[in-house]
Amino acid sequence: MNAHALGILEFSRLLAHVAGRATSAPGAAAVRALTPRTDREWIEAEHARVRAVRALVASELGWPTEPIPDIGEPLRRLRIEGLSWTALELLQGATLLRSSRRTRATLRDPRRPAIMLAYLVRYAEALVDLEPREQAIERAIGDDGTVRDDASPTLRKVRRDLRETEGQLVRLLEREMGKLEAHHQVSDLSVTMRNGRWVMPMRREARGYVGGIVHDSSGTGATIYVEPPAAVEFGNRVRELEIEEQREVERVLRALTDEIRPYHDAIGGAYDALVALDSLYARARYAIEAQCAPVTFGEPSAGFRIVDGRHPLLLASGGAVVPFDLTLHAGERTMLVSGPNTGGKTVLLKAIGLISMMAQCGVPAPLGETSQLAVFDDLYADVGDEQSIEASLSTFSAHLKNLGEILRSATTSSLVLIDELGSGTDPAEGAALGGAILETLTRRGTLTLATTHLGQLKLLATDVEGVVNASLQFDAVQLAPTYRLLKGVPGRSYGLSIARRLQIDEAVIQRAEERLPSGERDMAVLLADVEAREALLADRERLMEIDQEKLRARLATVGDRELKVREREREAERSARQEARRFLLEARGQVERAIADVKRQAQVEGEAFEETARAARRSIEEAAAEQGEAVAYVGLRGERDRARVDAKRGAAAAAANPSLGRTLRPERGAVAPLGEGDHVIVSTLDGKQGRIVSVRGQDARVAVGSLTVTVPLRTLTRSAAAPVSMYRTPILGDVPEVEPVREVDVRGLRVDEVDDQVLQALDAAVRNDLRELRIIHGKGTGALRSRVSEMLKKDTRVTGFRLGAWNEGGAGVTVAELA
């Protein structure tokens, strides 16, 4: 990538800002070393990796920030046999191994999203776990980087001897100092070490009295440091022990280095992976801080779309940054931006260049959602004043040199940024030259952004296909830039307006306006009108956005309320169904107990009893069918529930007492048969009156108030008069018909979904006089089997239950035995 253009954009400064978010010096260096790439596949993959790290940083578990020592050079030396690491380098190596092990474990934590870790698998696989080697180093080397005494038995003994010998030597020197005359002693000095030997200080004039070896003297020469003859032997012994200690330390370091040398490739790979992860972490943190949205990438021929773009360096400075939107479509190759000075044109060019280049480095750019960038093969920039006295280049010559390089090198996949095109020379010639350059680049297909003050260049968009005008909005009242980019509208320079604002003599301003060519004046009026209309449309757009936001908020509120209403309806329905289920279970229990009592008391044949029991059960099921969904009307339910209980009790009593049910004889003495439509008294319902709906054999369906029950004919007596009309509660919905089945399969259901299925199957089985019901629940965890067992224990219609035999499904099936 063009280093000259990157320098103009201050790209290294931007990378240094991002690198400041790394946790280690190697990681920061890796960020600073990033260069724009042209491989679209790599760029997209690198951004995906940054997004993965960003997601992990924002997750509950966070990101593992382990220390990464800078041991690139020691790692290169590790490959060479015979070379050893120093104690400090070994300690740094242990730190690296520990960071590798911990980061490896963190990235493989099953609690982390697998989809995110998939982008980082190449780094996770490169990390190593060499804990034994790590611990061996930490046992031998202390935190201060020195080899511990217990690194080896020999070292422990040598250092013990050294300490003892040095102690003896110091005591000897102190005794020798005590023998000196008072005027030969140096009162404020004591035994010390000079040039690796233990010595005692004394006055120079005492030299002839003591003898020995002088190892040093003070700056004035008045004090000398002497090793007396009596201390020489001890000093030699200390030196021998120091040499022996150093030899043993080197042996320990060599042994530790040799232990990790076979793993130099793995350790180097782990180091590179940790550095790469730290680089990704720095970029992810920058993306979070700068609120960078994910972007897509395309070919330069398709143009690009920048949404809420912000200048990265201005953003880094912490000041207020006005975002901009910019779209260049496939057929638009050149954008010519015009407007007054200090309007932000140069800042816009640099922002586009920086955004494109940082994205091609794998660094998220400060953009909004739906942005799409192009992948350029190179960047060319002619921005700023590059005059050079040494090179004898004027400003105009420097511009021409850069423009010549651009014309020679730029391709259809390049990005070209040109600031103040046509400036530095005669405006007419500058406009002609600038127009020719832009026309050449446009016809070549090079994506170009240029700024200018020359009015003639603004007309280029009408002559050359692919050239579009743009301007940075300027407040004509305040004479201050708004930095809002307007595509399709050329900008005015506002030179005379600014001069008037700065109180240049009005007569001068008026004369200047008179001297303007008529075409220029007409163009200025036209642009002013366009700007006013644009401002009006912008205001209306803002008002519409406010209204739309209010509408969205209102719709969201309505949606929330609707959800709450639906939830309340579902809760009411659940409560009603639970109440209905409880009521039916109680009713079934009462009837079954009544049948059991009758069976014990009645002296009837078994078959006759079974017939009456079946009739009683049918009455219960039909009463349940009439109930349906009406249980949702909780306020009207109480009276009806009591009537149903009475009906069930009456049916059971009728089944047990066949003497009931003879109809009253009319006065003539003939027996009048009961039929459909007759009004009757139901003896089993405490004499309540009803109307026969239908007759089937020895049973009749009778409408009693809001209920319809099935009772034996013998329990009915003709009523002399029609019953008093009763308020009939509307019944909404019906209990669905349940087909008789010998087995029900509840596999795949949740535990709280089993009840309805099993109860419906039991109802159908009892209604059709089945003796067994197979409930298939599967083996699994046993939760469904336990729930089925609990239900069967509580249901009085079930006389017993067992697990299935080997040919019935085994432990995956429960067989319920019915009365």
From Swiss-Prot:
Q: Its Gene Ontology biological processes?
A: mismatch repair; negative regulation of DNA recombination; rescue of stalled ribosome
Instruction: Report the enzyme's class at the first EC level.
Output: hydrolase
Instruction: Supply the EC number(s).
Output: 3.1.-.-, 3.6.4.-
Question: What region holds the Smr domain?
Answer: 744-819
Q: Cite the entry's keywords alphabetically.
A: ATP-binding, DNA-binding, Endonuclease, Hydrolase, Nuclease, Nucleotide-binding, RNA-binding, rRNA-binding
Domain of life (superkingdom) = Bacteria
Q: Where ATP is bound, by residue?
A: G339, P340, N341, T342, G343, G344, K345, T346
Which is an annotated GO molecular function term of this record?
rRNA binding
What SUPFAM superfamilies does the record tag this protein with?
Answer: DNA repair protein MutS, domain III, P-loop containing nucleoside triphosphate hydrolases, SMR domain-like
SMART domains (UniProt xref): MUTSac, MUTSd, SMR
Show the HAMAP family listed in the entry.
MutS2
Family the entry assigns: Belongs to the DNA mismatch repair MutS family. MutS2 subfamily.
Q: What does this protein do?
A: Endonuclease that is involved in the suppression of homologous recombination and thus may have a key role in the control of bacterial genetic diversity. Acts as a ribosome collision sensor, splitting the ribosome into its 2 subunits. Detects stalled/collided 70S ribosomes which it binds and splits by an ATP-hydrolysis driven conformational change. Acts upstream of the ribosome quality control system (RQC), a ribosome-associated complex that mediates the extraction of incompletely synthesized nascent chains from stalled ribosomes and their subsequent degradation. Probably generates substrates for RQC.
Assembly mode: Homodimer. Binds to stalled ribosomes, contacting rRNA.
Protein name as it appears in the record: Endonuclease MutS2
Q: Which organism is it from?
A: Gemmatimonas aurantiaca (strain DSM 14586 / JCM 11422 / NBRC 100505 / T-27)
Gene for this chain: mutS2
